Amino acid sequence: MENKEFEVGKFYRVHLYPTYGMSDKGIPGMVVRKLKKKVVFEYLSCFGGELHKMTVERRLIPASEGFHGVEEAVATGKWNSIGITEATDICDKPSRWDLVRGNEASGN
C-alpha cells in the first residue's frame, strides 16, 4: 500500500463502498483541507452539480490499483474511507469548480 501525502488544491478520486450506483472509477474531487488523520474532500454532486464535502481518511492508493478494499470495508464498517487515487483523467475541469464556487459565493 502506497502511503503518499495529499496536496490541498489537487484533484483526486475517492473510492467508496457501497458505491450507491456510482462507478468504480471513484468520485472526482479536490482536497480542500488537511486534518490530523483525515482530509476534507470536495466533489460535485452528480444530481444538480452542487458542491458537497466529505471527510475521508488520509489514505492514498496508487491509481494503478483502482477500486479495492471492499472486504476490508465490510470487516471494519469504514465504508466511506476505502481509498483515494490521484485523478489522472478527471472529467470535471478545475474551471467547473470555479464556476460552481462563484455561484455559491454570489448566492446563485
Model-predicted segments: where are they?
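Short intrinsically disordered terminal tails
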Residues: 1-8, 104-108
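Short coil-to-beta transition motif at edge beta-strands of beta-rich domains
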Residues: 3-22
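Short, solvent-exposed coil/turn segments at beta-strand boundaries
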Residues: 8, 33-36
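Surface loops and adjacent helix of pleckstrin homology
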Residues: 17, 44, 85
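Short solvent-exposed loop/turn micro-motifs enriched in small/polar/acidic residues
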Residues: 22-24, 53
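Short beta-strand-centered aromatic/proline hotspots
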Residues: 25-34
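SH3/SH3-like beta-barrel fold
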Residues: 39-43
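Intrinsically disordered, low-complexity, charged/polar segments
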Residues: 47-108
